[in-house]
Amino acid sequence: MRNWRWLLLVLAVLLAWLQYRFWFGPGNSGEVMMLEAQVAHQTQDNEGLRQRNQALAAEVKDLKDGEAAIEERARSELGMIKPGETFYRVVEDAPLPAPASPETAAPAQQAPASTDPVDHP
């Protein structure tokens, strides 16, 4: 009977020590949850960067292999045209200012109030 008590005491101390390490020791459950959240965030960032890299790789491949992409960039960014083409630029007139109505023009014609900081009786 006495051996059972010692065994039970040793097991209780061992359980208490393991629980302490689980909750408060190095690599505790809170730290593990924080690291899992960081891993999830980093995975999300990596996926975005992977998609960006794929788009850039496709653009590089298109620029190396195809003339259509180079021609499109030359036309849109540099304003270039092919020989024999005529370039037309359409410039719209600036909108005319709206005429001032008599109500809005009247306050502007009034004399400004005195700017003298001293009050006169």
UniProtKB/Swiss-Prot annotation:
Disulfide bonds, paired cysteine numbers: none
Keyword Thylakoid applies: no
UniProtKB keywords: Cell cycle, Cell division, Cell inner membrane, Cell membrane, Coiled coil, Membrane, Transmembrane, Transmembrane helix
Pfam families: DivIC (PF04977)
Subcellular location: Cell inner membrane
Residue ranges annotated as Periplasmic topological domain: 25-121
Recorded coiled-coil stretches: 31-66
Transmembrane annotation, as ranges: 7-24
Location of the region described as Disordered in the Swiss-Prot/TrEMBL record: 94-121
Subunit structure: Part of a complex composed of FtsB, FtsL and FtsQ.
PANTHER family, per the entry: CELL DIVISION PROTEIN FTSB
Cross-referenced NCBIfam families: PRK00888.1 (NF002058)
Function: Essential cell division protein. May link together the upstream cell division proteins, which are predominantly cytoplasmic, with the downstream cell division proteins, which are predominantly periplasmic.
Name assigned to this protein: Cell division protein FtsB
Organism: Xanthomonas oryzae pv. oryzae (strain KACC10331 / KXO85)
